[in-house]
Structures are given as structure tokens and as C-alpha cells.
Amino acid sequence: MDEKELIERAGGPVTRGRLVRDLEALGVGAGDTVMVHTRMSAIGYVVGGPQTVIDAVRDAVGADGTLMAYCGWNDAPPYDLAEWPPAWREAARAEWPAYDPLLSEADRGNGRVPEALRHQPGAVRSRHPDASFVAVGPAAHPLMDDHPWDDPHGPDSPLARLAGAGGRVLLLGAPLDTLTLLHHAEARAEAPGKRFVAYEQPVTVGGRRVWRRFRDVDTSRGVPYGRVVPEGVVPFTVIAQDMLAAGIGRTGRVAAAPVHLFEAADVVRFGVEWIESRMGGAAGGA
């Protein structure tokens, strides 16, 4: 889509001031801690790109507010590295650079904003190579510090801290299936057959690059949703739609983008109850 189409879709160029007004009308306010998921093209033609989006959200939350996003690691070793032919695997492992919170690029699949956010002055990125988050603002260190190596979406994760601190989640043109906070609900929920994964990634420990083994709920297929979600449908979309139907969250528009604003604690509570009520309740494992 070219610039003219994007401008026409939003009824004009999307400026920082326009974004701030729309965010404030939605209910984003001073002192908020907000995790944002963004699809830039849905907003329209944003004058200044991701930096303008970041500036606008920070304007809306003010000096006492904090902006958070999910990064991941764009160049992380693939989960199937152990299945590579031995010669290939060992050659890669011998020189694969360790994850560096300051240098390692955010996963491009998460959009442009996380990568831009991690470059902001004062940005704090969590230490987990596979599930890193980034935050800017007074709550950045409390949210990011000492991200647990194992169960990085579970208790004491940045997601758990977000919910515990009264944080919010903003889907700014991003689809409902990007609601990463629901992985925390998956980690907490007791569900028979819940699957876990173990994998290795290079990190720096004591000044040395080491391959560390991690354990986490399988964020691709950790909960056996197939019994209750039709094939081809993203489970998070169904959960989020049910959540909205239950009156949880606010819906509006920011420029051309459809937006949703959720209280993080409400998302976690609803997600856990949704999973447990449909999966049978008793804890399972793998």
C-alpha cells in the first residue's frame, strides 16, 4: 500500500498530536504502564514512523508512565537446531553469538515498534534470549530485571509483573491473536495435556558465552485447544473475542486503526478461567 492510500485511509497524515488525542480519548492516561502491540500499516501514514508512535504513547502516559513491548530475538537459534546434521549443528553452535540485550535485534515478526523502543534512551530489555521484553519509564527495571530463565511467561515474568502492577495492554491496530499476555494465562492455567518445551540458546554468564538449557510452556501448542477451537482458527483470537463479548476491555480507533485497551489483570484472570473451564481443570504435564 502506497503513501497516498495510507493517508486517505486515515483521512490525512497521522501525526504525534493526533495519536495522543486519540489515545487519551480511548482512556490511556498519565501514570499508566502499557504494553503495546502495533501494526503500523493499520494506523495510516504515520509521520515519523515507529518513533512517532512511541513518542505519542509516552506523551499519553506522561513522565510517571511506562511503555513496554515484546521483543524476542530475531536471530535466535531455531528450536530444531538439535535435529540438524551433526557437522552443521556443531559448526553453528561453536560460533553462534550470545544473546545480548543491548545488541540483539528484536524479532521482526513483532513489528517495527519493539526494535525502535529498545533503542530509546533509558530502555531496559530483559535478559531472556527467547522471550525478551523491553520497557521505558519508571517501572522499566521492576518489570524487566531478573527475568526468570525457566518458565519465562509464568510467575515473576515481566507479564506477571505487568498484571500485578495494574498494567494495561494496548492493541494498536494489531490483531487479537497478538495478545502475548495470554501466554501468561497458559503458563498459569491447570490443563490436562499441557505441553512444555526444552531448548538451548547461547547467553553470557560470568563473562563467558555458554549454551544454556531453558524450559517453558510450548507457546505454539502448549494447550491442546483442538478440542474446543476449530481447525485453522487462532485460539487467542477466540479467547479475546469472548473476553470482549463479556464486556472486558475498551474498543475504539486511533487514526485508522481499530484498537483495544485491556486491563492486564483482567486478561490473565479471564484467560486462565477460559482455559481451565474448557480443558478440564486438573493439572497436566509433559
UniProtKB/Swiss-Prot annotation:
The keyword Metal-binding does not apply. One of its GO terms (biological process) is response to antibiotic. The keyword Iron does not apply. SUPFAM superfamilies: TTHA0583/YokD-like (SSF110710). One of its GO terms (molecular function) is aminoglycoside 3-N-acetyltransferase activity. Keywords: Acyltransferase, Antibiotic resistance, Transferase. It catalyses: a 2-deoxystreptamine antibiotic + acetyl-CoA = an N(3)-acetyl-2-deoxystreptamine antibiotic + CoA + H(+). It holds the Pfam family Antibiotic_NAT. Belongs to the antibiotic N-acetyltransferase family. This is Aminoglycoside N(3)-acetyltransferase VIII. It comes from Streptomyces fradiae. The lineage of its organism: Bacteria, Bacillati, Actinomycetota, Actinomycetes, Kitasatosporales.
